Amino acid sequence: MSAQDFLVELGSEELPPKALKSLATAFLAGIEKGLAAAGLEYRVARFYAAPRRLAVLVEHLVAQQPDRTLNLDGPPVAAAFDAEGNPTQAALGFARKCGVELHEIDSSGAKLRYSRHIPGQPASALLPAIVQASLDELPIPKRMRWGTRKEEFVRPSQWLVMLFGNQVVDCEILAQKAGRESMGHRFHHPDAVRISQPSSYLEDLRSAYVLADFAERRELIAGRVADLAAQQQGSAVVPEDLLDEVTALVEWPVPLVCSFEERFLTVPQEALISTMQDNQKYFCLLDANGKLLPCFITVANIESRDPAQIVAGNEKVVRPRLTDAEFFFNQDKRQPLESFNQRLASVVFQAQLGSVLEKAERVSRLAGFIAERIGGDPQHAIRAGLLSKADLASEMVGEFPELQGIAGYHYALNAGEPEDIARALDEQYMPRGAGAQLPSTLTGAAVAMADKLDTLVGIFGIGMPPTGSKDPYALRRAALGILRILIEKQLDLNLEEASHFAVAQYGTKVKASGLAEQVSEFVFDRLRARYEDEGIDVSSYLAVRALQPASAYDLDLRVQAVQAFRRLPEAEALAAVNKRVSNLLGKYEGKLPAAIEARYFDNASEFSLYSALQQAQHAVRPLAAERRYREALERLASLRDPVDAYFEAVLVNAEDPAIRANRHAMLAQLRGLFLCVADISVLGQ
């Protein structure tokens, strides 16, 4: 079957840069979906995207849709005709549904069947509808109309290229008649560009100063920015989302180095970086020590004969932004950080939970409680908690909200606070996202956990837990943040105890009954989802959770040990044995003897298991006490043979009550050893 390349390019006014990549990938996905539904095979498809165009190139697309046979089954033949052979209403209704006469329907099988041969259509006849459907399904939150047209799109359409092979596909989409003329660079090549065939698309546009390949432009910008940064003896700060956005802003990228006055370097560099990245889309440069250099890189969309003019223009534009940041910083420094707390008394944290100042006071007390239990400095944590929200009332954070915590760090140092306290003001918001950096100090860890736990307790306490996909207070993220800090920093904290303390700080603002348990259960449940993401069996988590450990760090050590135990050859049999033992003990009526007495043994396997249990007990309990859970389970795995022999030779529910009690006591000791780590019986369910 013959095949040719297919190209579609929709030209428009400048597309939203932050959405360009997602629009392009969705456009490609929609076309691939349409081709698959139509049965049109192809070799490969890829998207291209630039500020004024979305394009898809499909290589080696078949020219003809394959023929199909449509089979429709109707009612059973017995129900389709009466005893005299006359058609029933069921048969007549099926014929009407198929749009044919009854004699055209096959009645030779168990059911009536109508088969129709559907010849395939030319690909060129199907492509317009496929493209239109893909455009209709693009993730555009708000479409617009332009002029007097009824068509809607994210931006007004300007032209349409649609080629199958070297032939134009005859159609009209978004009020644009398909042709082979695209447009070049707005300034370097403002004239139309003739696309001779799909395979020449990139080169035809390149000759018109347009790099249509998003990935190529992105790589070019990243490489050139890195080279220019090296020439300045620095390295560029290149966030992925900023690189994508800049790539979406230019068709012919030309990176240039600009500079600003060194006096601005007295301002916290995070503020300067923030304004240059967010407002101007510049790439900032750092020296070998991570300090901001007084220069930046802008990416022009034009190859100027006088690049110095572009450099001067960008330097002129950025200066007022940096001056504003400098002004806010100097204004804020005129007063002690703690004085900002007065303004927080009138700022609402949550209508039912009081002001931000009240939250800071609660966080302060809770942070001191936590710090004492994780080996930190309670007084530092109390002080850091009290100052934790002060910078929210500053001019700097008012202008740059993303600097909350960072501004507090600098203002705390300026006010003479210890480094440990100042750093905690920044670290309270850590981790700022999945996999993000954790607090480096115990004071920071204490304040970060206190802040998150206070929010969890408060929102749960007024009956507003997350429901389904709705989590307006980011409580799931807060819970995961607490867990990451505890587990990855190996901090031992009784979460339920901390939750009870947090509940007490709210007084009558929350419904306290059962609240601490509800919050700690919610936090631990986030671990289940985390383990699933990491490929750890849910049953490993449930086996440990059955013991209700209060420390997330301890729970994680146990889960990792159980997961390793599962890979041992003895694991499956011992899990089944634990399940059996659990059932036997659950059905036993009466009090178990305090000690196992060998005088009741009447079988060699009893002596063997008893001896193995005594040896295991001396080895396992010290290992468990030292939290060497993996070694403990490896040692318990050696019990498989004596346990198997015991159950083969011994009737646990003996008729003699004393013997029966003694045997159950030995099983209780066996189970108790495993419960030093986890309820292994869960693995056998």
Curated annotation (Swiss-Prot):
Where it sits in the cell: the answer is: Cytoplasm
Cystine links in this protein are none
Q: Which reaction does it catalyse?
A: tRNA(Gly) + glycine + ATP = glycyl-tRNA(Gly) + AMP + diphosphate
GO cellular component terms, alphabetically, are:
cytosol
One Pfam family named in its UniProt record? DALR_1
Specify where it is mainly localized: cytoplasm
A GO MF label: glycine-tRNA ligase activity
Q: Which UniProt keywords apply?
A: Aminoacyl-tRNA synthetase, ATP-binding, Cytoplasm, Ligase, Nucleotide-binding, Protein biosynthesis
Q: Which InterPro entries match?
A: DALR_anticod-bd, Gly-tRNA-synth_bsu, Gly-tRNA-synth_heterodimer
As recorded in UniProt, its EC number(s) are 6.1.1.14
- Record keywords: Calcium included? no
Question: Which BP terms does GO give this entry?
Answer: arginyl-tRNA aminoacylation; glycyl-tRNA aminoacylation
Supply the NCBIfam families for this chain. glyS
Q: Tell me, how does this one assemble? A: Tetramer of two alpha and two beta subunits.
Q: What protein family does this chain belong to?
A: Belongs to the class-II aminoacyl-tRNA synthetase family.
Record protein name field: Glycine--tRNA ligase beta subunit
Q: Which organism is it from?
A: Azotobacter vinelandii (strain DJ / ATCC BAA-1303)
* Gene from which the chain derives: glyS
